[in-house]
Amino acid sequence: MIKNYPEIIPIFPLGGVIYFPKTNLPLNIFEQRYLDLVNDIYNKDKLMGMIQPQKNNNSFFKVGCLGKITDFQKSKDGRIMINLTGITRFEILNEVKNNKLYKEFKVDYKKFNKDFSSSSYNEEMSSFMIKAKNFFKKNGLLLNWKEFDNLDNGQKINTLAMIAPITNEEKQKLLEAITLKFLGLPKVC
């Protein structure tokens, strides 16, 4: 089920940060263009996209994550601290020209309609979790698995993808995967 999310969204490109649905991302905003972006959306629908810039050029990966501001605090020195809660992934269709300091893009959410259903992962989840636990143990990573079990399947998958000790390019591939079958994390476990 895709809700009526905007087809034109402002984009916050941030290298080294891959952001997933059903996860939270704290951000410290200090550049004027992104202060403008956050102020504009906070007074509107609170929705913005996070996208990974590609290396060595001014383009972006085609898949990012739509998030909603769920916490907003201004500091005395003009910075804004926000928490962004991931909603769904999107695919960039094209840039929309504007007179703003930040970029806006026309996006499509259809490919990622399973972001709204944790039950779509049920069949493969048991095998995936065994492989994920082995992967984390093998890499010396500690995780409170009892607490982790309280998350829904979508949150589990996306949280593991965010915190896994893999490259940003590998995380981007995980973000672009449409279903658990295409995730790739079990292949590296």
Where are the regions that the model predicts?
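N-terminal low-complexity, acidic/polar interaction/targeting segments
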Residues: 1-189
